[in-house]
Amino acid sequence: NLYAGGPLNLPSEQYGAGENWYKAGRSFKADYSYNSSTEEAFLCAHYAIDTNGRLICNGNYESYTLDVTIYEDEDRHVSYEFRDEQDRLLLNRNQLRSHQGFLDTYYVYDQVGNLRYVIPPALSLAGLTDDSIEKYAFIYEYDSKRRCIRKQLPGGVVVTYIYDKADRLRMSQDSNQAD
């Protein structure tokens, strides 16, 4: 393993076991940077939840407000992870094998830090409409104790969770079981 300089001593390159991986230059690389409001690979849309609980997009994050880790696997496929100051994953971006664009998966949190939406690549390409959110998004709801009580999967399948007084999950039921 090789490590980046600096006080955090973060790994920058790792090889699989055996000399063949090293001789072939087949390593897993990591580089560390910040987001940018001008460079396409480093743009990150700023999704949020409005006062009515609806998913909205507030443009892009300002430059240098998010940490970005750039990964390159043994086959030279590149992916990016964008994290906020609370180290929450906001965006997982994978470069297409043809290097002609990206597939983005966004993670949207509420004001107390609960994951509320997962926006897969199909939705980030389709745009935010009620129909596209219903069709493609993962949507999570929580109770006052921050327990997930409802999960909606792409296509509208709903899973409900019931907890006992000791906060243990007692039952989960999807919409097929409810019928």
Task: Annotate each PLM feature.
Residues N1-D179:
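Beta-strand elements of repeat-based all-beta scaffolds
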